[in-house]
Amino acid sequence: MHTRPLGPSGIEASVVAFGAWAIGGWRWGGTDEAQAIRAVHAGIDAGITLFDTAPVYGFGLSDSLLGQALAGKRDKIILATKCGLICDPTKGVKHFSTNALNFDDDGLIQVNRHSGGESIRREVEASLRRLKTDHLDLLQTHWQDTLTPFGETMQAMLDLKKEGKIRAIGVCNATSQQMAQYQAAGQLDSDQEKYSMLFRGIEKDQLPYCQNHSMAMLAYSPLAQGLLTGKLTTDRQFALGDLRR
């Protein structure tokens, strides 16, 4: 497995990453926990070192499954997670509402974008507990909170880095203008964006910015959520709650 530097962070990560959204079950029609753990182990055996999760993936389930699967293997992998999406309608700006894990439940959970300093710290502490680790290799803002000053968000992450709780700082789903505002307050190591043969919009904005600022570009959904694998047929039936349905 080839590796590449994670921007200027000094971290080397595999060019193929394990995206952990699906193992959380939410919006993927549920999950088989034993199979999810086997998939993580298979990824490690194949040479994958970069594992990327987020608190909103299964509302903590993805984190918890990774924590179980990585027991005794933590020193072999680069663990990336995210912050900035919280289940608190009183803070930040609304991002979406969902039926969460039980898709037959009529009660909606509202998820807001909020990247205030204290909120980020709470999210990180909760992620560390679920993942059963004492540090995160990469912390990324999941979606940008336009109500919180970018400098406040960056300072919170810099403080966590100084404390040894994170090693590198990144963003996801950010414009070049937003990245520039973050970088006015501190160093960004990476940006994660949707990128595949079918979705190439970042080639005009985010990708050139990252190249010009020596940042790593992490691509999510590079196989268009399975569409480009060649394994999906027109008669494929997806479970209730699966975003591909």
Name each model feature, range by range.
Residues 1-81, 85-89:
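N-terminal binding-site loop/beta-alpha segment at the start of enzyme catalytic domains
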Residues 3, 144-245:
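Beta/alpha (TIM)-barrel catalytic core signal, keyed to glycine-rich beta->alpha loops juxtaposed to Asp/Glu
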Residues 6, 18, 36, 51, ...:
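Conserved, mostly hydrophobic/aromatic
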Residues 11-16, 47-49, 73-77, 133-137, ...:
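Short, well-ordered coil/turn segments that N-cap beta-strands
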Residues 30-43, 113-131, 175-181:
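Short, acidic/polar
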Residues 40, 63, 67, 124-128, ...:
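Generic structural signal for well-ordered alpha-helices
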Residues 90-103, 232-243:
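Short, flexible, mixed-charge acidic loops at enzyme active sites
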Residues 102-115, 245:
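Short glycine/proline- and acidic residue-enriched helix-loop micro-motifs
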